[in-house]
Amino acid sequence: LWHTPNLYLNSKQEKVGKLLGDGYDYLAYFCNSGAEANEAALKLARKATGREKIISFKDSFHGRTFGAMTATGQESIQAGFGSLVPHFSYLTYNYLPDLEQLDETVAAVILELVQGEGGVLPAEKVWIKALSAICHEKGILVIVDEVQTGMGRTGTFYAFEQYPLLPDIVT
């Protein structure tokens, strides 16, 4: 995709935005990078829910800006930069018992449906189904980071289309 400043209407951007949300009740926000998209998703989740806590997963990768780096579940990426953004916790990917930690204090869960830096590890459908149900029940937003898996790279336009999941926010 391409990007021009959001200061004025761009007809091509408008057309692409509509295509990206085609078939879903989604709006598009254009930005410069995957990290910026994830930062916007985290801010939107906190603003929309009024909650601060964000859940991510060990061995995930969401970017190198402060919020996205904090969401990244890898100490090697986070080391050396001082204090991270508060109110982030990390669960074990594809591990059903950890989902019991999701409660009404959580604003959002951010995840990749295929963890690239975690070893090219796809999410298990039973785990996604449970995660989705718990999040829906407790008012937790689901953010799917499609920066590496979207645009047809996994066989469907969005990777989430292969799972029993309709995310609230897609990056």
Regions found by a protein language model. Name each.
Residues 1-171:
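Conserved N-terminal phosphate-binding loop of PLP-dependent enzymes in the Aspartate aminotransferase
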